[in-house]
Amino acid sequence: MSIQNSLPDYQSFDETLHQQSVALTAAEMHGLISGLLCGGNRDSSWQVLVHDLANDGLAFSHPLAQKLRELREITFESLDDSNFAFGLLLPDEEDNVFERADALAGWVNHFLLGLGVAQPKFADRKEISEIIGDLRNIGLLGYEEGDDQEELSQALEEVLEYVQVAAQLCYIAFTEPKTVLIAKNDKPTLH
């Protein structure tokens, strides 16, 4: 099973969030968690940050908290994967293209929120400033109900690919790969 295929089912996860009275969609939650990870957040503080940003500072129920931990772990593994397996949690391709466009815009906006919380001065980084500008524009994604759905679908796929690469570039800019961290931790201790 590929890492991409191990993301939860969008509709099911979205319903779980709604049932728990979380104001974020599944796409927005995944964007937020992805942004925190890409900003270099590696410790358990991510949970408190997600509580603050998505649930008025209140902890989630145990079942939802477990699903969020699993989502974070899958996302972390996919970002750290050398095969670039990172994917976005969005509605299925068979779903309405307008819903997918809205979900992508929500994912991007919450990704930028998470990135900004983890890296408050991310805009100062020259190597990613253009990417951040592009993501901000994508977050404002708009369409007309009368737009050709086929054209919009093709454009959406291109933008989606760009967002995936942009997120991975942010991850590379702000974090060290897991293998480097493991190597640092495995250094012998000098007594």
From Swiss-Prot:
Gene Ontology cellular component list: cytosol
InterPro entries xref list: YgfB-like (IPR011978), YgfB-like_sf (IPR036255)
Pfam families assigned to the protein according to its UniProt record, in alphabetical order: UPF0149
Family indicated by similarity: Belongs to the UPF0149 family.
Protein name stated in the entry: UPF0149 protein plu3602
Organism phylogeny: Bacteria, Pseudomonadati, Pseudomonadota, Gammaproteobacteria, Enterobacterales
